[in-house]
Curated annotation (Swiss-Prot):
Name of this protein: Enolase
Membership in a protein family: Belongs to the enolase family.
Underlying gene: ENO1
Organism encoding this protein: Oryza sativa subsp. japonica (Rice)
Biological classification of the source: Eukaryota, Viridiplantae, Streptophyta, Embryophyta, Tracheophyta
Chain residues that bind Mg(2+): 251, 302, 329
Keyword line: Cytoplasm, Glycolysis, Lyase, Magnesium, Metal-binding
Active site annotation, chain numbering: 216 (proton donor), 354 (proton acceptor)
Signal peptide span: none
Cofactor binding remark: Mg(2+) is required for catalysis and for stabilizing the dimer.
Annotated PANTHER family: ENOLASE
Length: 446
């Protein structure tokens, strides 16, 4: 007799920013117990599936009691007696039948909330792995039909700007990727050493308080020029002795400083007395990136333009997409419909995989498979509001995404994922493969 679900219980817990989020426990007839919690983002794309919040004055409107109630009163009774190893069936049942809301980009989870559905989807996935007596990463690989497990290159967000930081920096994340490491363990060593070198460089140049950390564990020194951020990384990499082995990635989050009225980008958007003198066109911004790429070892640029600026995405991908990965986050929001459009229009060449943007494990797998078949790279990602849940570490290995960004090597909700990857690499032993320089295409499409 196959194990079946006997209970599904949701509760409100807190993320790393002190905001409420949803956690779900699933119990099965064979005694299996699994628990999962969902994250939430600060710079959210307008096309993301609905994250249901309560509104009102409690928790400044960010409570999730409605989402919790939706799990406990709508989803839970409907899942009792079902087989937790049937991931796609249960995800589709929740998304299409229990929720059933759609917009032009597909199933939008407006009724129950993507945070409610995803928490259950993640917990079911963990339960399925336990029932099958296999590691979670292997269960995910099996669900996707992937034969080759790969440890991802970590992209450590070590300098914060944009909506994540109180400084004047327009661009949101400056990352280091240890592509020259031979294993994930060595990648962690390189990342940590560059991080500590960066800390001392910043402290010396900007003073003690410049090494306070942001939401994702990176530093937010009060620098204004984006180029200065790149210069700091270059110096820290040199000081650590990893020039050529550690490269640079950026997440610009350009939607945050795009002006839809005059179609310009304002690199001075955080300045109180902003006179608009720093506003530039999409073409000018593209040239800024090209100059960065010619001067620094940049291998990845995420969200270089607004989430609706398909035109400049395509131009940039055509011009520098060979040497640099152009990653769609707000552009794609892990949505298979938007991924299909971007593939057709050659808008970018990599997917940022955030499970809570789409709201189920099955739809996330679909977006990854589509991306890989198009020859794209895939970067698994956390959100700025995280929990101690480590699901995305197993997800990155199981789907062989080749890359993961889950913050700096600082703050326990970030290290939880990196530490889980260390355990997975150890468990795989001689079979462990680190993506390294092949981070954009670590395996054949599946």
């Amino acid at each position: 007799m196959a194990a079946t679900i006997v209970s599904v219980k949701a509760r409100q817990i807190f993320d790393s920013r002190g905001n409420p989020t949803v956690e779900v426990d699933v119990c099965c007839s064979d005694g299996t117990f699994a628990r999962a919690a969902v994250p939430s983002g600060a710079s959210t794309g307008v096309y993301e599936a609905l994250e249901l919040r309560d509104g009102g004055s409690d928790y400044l409107g960010k409570g999730v009691s409605k989402a919790v109630d939706n799990v406990n009163s709508v989803i839970a009774p409907a899942l009792i007696g079902k087989d937790p190893t049937s991931q796609a069936e249960l995800d589709n049942f929740m998304v299409q039948q229990l929720d059933g809301t759609k917009n032009e980009w597909g199933w939008c989870k407006q009724k129950l909330g993507a945070n409610a559905i995803l928490a259950v989807s993640l917990a079911i996935c963990k339960a399925g792995a336990i029932i099958k007596k296999i590691p979670l990463y292997q269960h995910i690989a099996n669900l996707a039909g992937n034969k080759q497990l790969v440890l991802p290159v970590p992209a450590f967000n070590v300098i914060n700007g944009g909506s994540h930081a109180g400084n004047k920096l327009a661009m949101q994340e400056f990352m280091i990727l240890p592509t020259g490491a031979a294993s994930f363990k060595e990648a962690m060593k390189m990342g940590v050493e560059v991080y500590h070198n960066l800390k001392s460089v910043i402290k010396k140049k900007y003073g003690q308080d410049a090494t306070n950390v942001g939401d994702e564990g990176g530093f937010a020194p009060n620098i204004q020029e984006n180029k200065e951020g790149l210069e700091l990384l270059k110096t820290a990499i040199e000081k650590a002795g990893y020039t050529g082995k550690v490269v640079i990635g950026m997440d610009v989050a350009a939607s945050e400083f795009y002006n839809d009225k005059d179609k310009t980008y304002d690199l001075n958007f955080k300045e109180e007395n902003n006179d608009g003198s720093q506003k530039i066109s999409g073409d000018s911004l593209k040239n800024v990136y090209k100059s960065f790429v010619s001067e620094y070892p940049i291998v990845s640029i995420e969200d270089p333009f607004d989430q609706d600026d398909w035109e400049h995405y395509a131009k940039m991908t055509a011009e520098i997409g060979e040497q640099v990965q152009i990653v769609g986050d707000d552009l794609l929001v892990t949505n298979p419909t938007r991924v299909a459009k971007a593939i057709q229009e050659k808008s970018c060449n990599a997917l940022l995989l955030k499970v809570n943007q789409i709201g189920s494990v099955t739809e996330s797998i679909e977006a990854v498979k589509m991306s890989k078949r198009a020859g794209w790279g895939v970067m698994t990602s956390h959100r700025s509001g995280e929990t101690e849940d480590t699901f995305i570490a197993d997800l990155a290995v199981g789907l062989a995404t080749g890359q993961i960004k889950t913050g700096a090597p600082c703050r326990s909700e970030r290290l939880a994922k990196y530490n889980q990857l260390l355990r997975i690499e150890e468990e795989l032993g001689a079979a462990a493969v680190y993506a390294g320089a092949k981070f954009r295409a670590p395996v054949e499409p599946y």
